[in-house]
From Swiss-Prot:
Role, per record: Catalyzes the interconversion of beta-pyran and beta-furan forms of D-ribose.
Transmembrane segments: none
Catalytic reactions of this protein: beta-D-ribopyranose = beta-D-ribofuranose
InterPro entries: D-ribose_pyranase, RbsD-like_sf, RbsD_FucU
MF annotations from Gene Ontology: D-ribose pyranase activity; intramolecular lyase activity; intramolecular transferase activity; monosaccharide binding
EC main group: isomerase
Name recorded for this polypeptide: D-ribose pyranase
Pfam hit, one: RbsD_FucU
């Protein structure tokens, strides 16, 4: 049995295929994720699993250099923003973009996976940009 953090085979596969500058998104339950091969639906019920728990687990296995968040999170979900900032290194660049642009990242050619959580707080969506480990 696998010993590392991510046990879900689809998330594990997405992370394994990621190269430098590729993206992986983690989303709340309301994000309109395209129904294609990149969709990884973990939602069981409202707030299960939580966005922040999935993010923390993915960060244990994925080297990132930059994150993208919706500009709207600052006003509409500052608690989630603080939790995200606590999880990531201060060296990681945070880029705030309009929520509509976050939606367009779901179909971006460099995006290797769109994870849907059960999160029901607004603007709990993130795009992780991969870095190299060397």
């Amino acid at each position: 049995m696998k010993k590392s953090a991510v046990l879900n085979e689809h998330i594990s596969k997405a992370i394994a295929t990621i190269g430098h500058f590729d993206l992986l998104t983690i989303n709340d339950a309301g994000m309109p994720i395209p129904n294609d091969h990149r969709r990884i639906d973990l939602a069981v019920t409202k707030n299960l699993p939580r966005f922040i728990d999935v993010l923390a687990t993915v960060l244990e296995e994925m080297e990132i250099q930059k994150i993208y968040l919706a500009e709207e999170i600052k006003e509409h979900n500052p608690t989630q923003l603080q939790q995200i900032k606590q999880l990531i290194s201060s060296e990681i660049e945070i880029i705030f973009i309009p929520h509509e642009e976050m939606k367009s990242n779901l179909a971006h050619p460099l995006n290797k996976g769109n994870i849907r959580t059960g999160e029901t707080t607004p603007y709990s969506n993130i795009a992780l940009e991969s870095n190299v480990t060397f």
